[in-house]
């Protein structure tokens, strides 16, 4: 690869940088640009109805600033702006934002679209990067700065017209391609714009510093932001905003570090929609904060519904591995991961943890409207813990610990044979085939139990008479023991159908619908190998005897 054709991005000279020692303690001002920056990047931009649906969803999520479009760019954008205002669809506590280039006719059209608005942010921009000055516009620094000043003057002029006297306007300026602009020049241009607007602590202006193209590592962007914050005159009268893109795949980190570096505000989209590789995903950054115990002041407790509405409006698809929102996020294919999750959830249920602490799960899926049933997925790489979790959580079977490896091998083999992931229903189907439906060579037809009380020895025993099918032929057996399980086991030995060693016995109630059944687990040892059997019935004795038959049948098949 021709790596020599690229030049390393320069470092920022910043003495005594402070951002590495800081933590995010509160949410920034969030501004959604889904309806503008996100919409312009769609193969098929949203129509007015889809935009209204998206706008209402953004309001429900909790955004207080929403960039709704570029009203001077098209009739659809203009019509949408007018509809929001005329139909009074903008809540009292929400401010819309519109974008315009620094050209007279575009600024005029923008303000016409805003007639009757209560509050609006007017966002004006021009590119300041060295590359675009030289290659695209062929203008020098003074000429580009002059464009910015004229844009600032125009939006100020129109905002002061009497027809807008009932509206409040906040001004925002972006030196587009800030990350490709010399820092001292970007500062010079922004201060020239602010000198026109003359913001105050009571009436602040917004300076937005976009990584229009992500060009370096997040720490470099943080250095740029801290440098800018420290050098900017009248800083207390300015809301410093970030607008990161994801060309290098690190825009979330850039925005997070930018907040540490002193920024007050963040622009982005849901799920990172935007030009090329996309914008900052505000949902991602907000839930990163949430996972650290910081209130993001945005509501994502119905994340599945948000994903569905987003996909319907944009015709885009949220990736299965997308942080927090993807279908596979709260899943675990690895056996060791599944086992750890199972133990973590059990510990949480028992109240042992004050805070959320579950291995491999950064947040509680329930907080986002997700379900625990989605967590464990079973394939050929899965382990014993995952299959045991599915059997307990989905079907109520609490498999003995020693049974986990055995059943895990059964499921692994089935998954290998089918070459696919197994659903809970398939897992239960294979469980029944392996443990409950195997009737060869033995099958219990009927039995009778008699209690024997030896008064002299103060000992109670049980006598059992049973009819079993052996390879399709009915045979009567009889045995005595300390209980039904022991008696039946001995009865099988008496007929030499057994020859096995009894290892363990477990049982528990099994609730299926409105009926309660008993399930029993028996482990035996035959020729130095151990086998489990399972029985289920309304009667615990029947369940226990069937568990023995199940174990014996499995031992004959191996």
Curated annotation (Swiss-Prot):
Catalytic activity: 3-methyl-2-oxobutanoate + acetyl-CoA + H2O = (2S)-2-isopropylmalate + CoA + H(+)
Region Regulatory domain, residue ranges: 438-558
Residue span(s) of domain Pyruvate carboxyltransferase: 28-304
Pathway: Amino-acid biosynthesis; L-leucine biosynthesis; L-leucine from 3-methyl-2-oxobutanoate: step 1/4
EC number, as in UniProt: 2.3.3.13
Entry keywords, A to Z: Amino-acid biosynthesis, Branched-chain amino acid biosynthesis, Cytoplasm, Leucine biosynthesis, Magnesium, Metal-binding, Transferase
Protein's cellular compartments: Cytoplasm
UniProt-listed GO biological process terms: L-leucine biosynthetic process
Cofactor(s) required, per the database record: Mg(2+)
Similarity comment text for this entry: Belongs to the alpha-IPM synthase/homocitrate synthase family. LeuA type 2 subfamily.
Biological role stated in the UniProt entry: Catalyzes the condensation of the acetyl group of acetyl-CoA with 3-methyl-2-oxobutanoate (2-ketoisovalerate) to form 3-carboxy-3-hydroxy-4-methylpentanoate (2-isopropylmalate).
PANTHER family: 2-ISOPROPYLMALATE SYNTHASE, PTHR46911
Self-association state and partner proteins as the record states: Homodimer.
Name of the protein: 2-isopropylmalate synthase
Organism: Clostridium acetobutylicum (strain ATCC 824 / DSM 792 / JCM 1419 / IAM 19013 / LMG 5710 / NBRC 13948 / NRRL B-527 / VKM B-1787 / 2291 / W)
Lineage of the species this protein comes from: Bacteria, Bacillati, Bacillota, Clostridia, Eubacteriales
């Amino acid at each position: 690869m021709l790596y020599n054709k690229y030049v390393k991005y320069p470092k920022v000279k910043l003495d005594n940088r402070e951002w590495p020692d800081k933590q995010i303690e509160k949410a920034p001002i969030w501004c959604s640009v889904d309806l503008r920056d996100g919409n312009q990047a769609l193969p098929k931009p949203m129509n007015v109805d889809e935009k209204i649906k998206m706008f209402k969803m953004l309001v429900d999520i909790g955004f207080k600033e929403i960039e709704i479009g570029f009203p001077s760019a098209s009739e659809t954008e203009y019509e949408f702006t007018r509809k929001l205002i005329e139909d009074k669809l903008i809540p009292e506590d929400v401010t819309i934002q519109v974008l315009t280039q620094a050209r007279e006719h575009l600024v005029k059209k923008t303000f016409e679209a805003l007639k009757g608005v209560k509050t609006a942010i007017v966002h004006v921009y021009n590119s300041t990067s060295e590359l675009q000055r030289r290659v695209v516009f062929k203008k020098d620094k003074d000429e580009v700065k002059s464009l910015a000043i004229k844009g600032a003057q125009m939006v100020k002029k129109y905002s002061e017209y009497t027809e807008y006297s009932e509206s409040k306007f906040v001004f925002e300026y972006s030196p587009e391609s800030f990350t490709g602009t010399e820092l001292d020049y970007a500062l010079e241009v922004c201060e020239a714009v602010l000198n026109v607007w003359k913001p105050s602590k009571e009436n602040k202006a917004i300076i937005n510093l976009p990584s229009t193209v992500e060009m370096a590592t997040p720490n470099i962007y943080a250095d740029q932001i801290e440098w800018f914050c420290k050098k900017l005159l009248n800083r207390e009268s300015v809301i410093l905003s970030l607008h990161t893109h994801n060309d290098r795949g690190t825009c979330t980190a850039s925005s997070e570090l930018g907040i540490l570096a002193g920024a007050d505000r963040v622009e982005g989209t849901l799920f990172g929609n935007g030009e090329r590789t996309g914008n900052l995903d505000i949902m991602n950054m907000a839930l990163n904060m949430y996972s650290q115990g910081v209130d993001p002041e945005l509501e994502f407790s119905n994340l599945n519904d948000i994903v569905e509405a987003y996909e319907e409006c944009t015709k885009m698809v949220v990736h299965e591995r997308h942080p927090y929102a993807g279908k596979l996020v709260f899943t675990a294919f690895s056996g060791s991961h599944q086992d750890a999750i199972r133990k973590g959830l059990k510990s949480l249920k028992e109240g042992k943890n004050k805070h959320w602490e579950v291995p491999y799960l950064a947040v509680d899926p329930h907080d986002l409207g997700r379900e625990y049933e989605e967590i464990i997925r079973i394939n050929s790489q899965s382990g014993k813990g995952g299959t045991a979790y599915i059997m307990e959580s989905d079907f109520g079977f609490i498999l003995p610990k020693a049974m986990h490896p055995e059943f895990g091998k059964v499921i692994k083999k089935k998954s290998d044979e089918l070459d696919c992931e197994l659903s809970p229903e398939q897992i239960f189907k294979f469980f029944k085939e392996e443990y409950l439906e195997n009737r060869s060579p033995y099958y219990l037809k009927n039995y009778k139990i008699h209690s024997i009380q030896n008064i002299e020895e103060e000992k109670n025993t049980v006598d059992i008479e049973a009819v079993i099918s052996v390879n399709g032929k009915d045979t009567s057996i009889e045995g005595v023991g300390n209980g039904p399980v022991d008696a039946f086991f001995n009865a099988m030995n008496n007929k030499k159908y057994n020859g096995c060693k009894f290892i363990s016995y477990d049982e528990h109630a099994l609730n299926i619908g409105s009926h309660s059944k008993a399930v029993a687990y028996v482990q035996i040892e035959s020729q130095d190998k151990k086998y489990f059997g399972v029985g289920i019935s309304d009667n615990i004795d029947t369940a226990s005897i069937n568990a023995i038959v199940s174990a014996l049948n499995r031992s004959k098949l191996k």
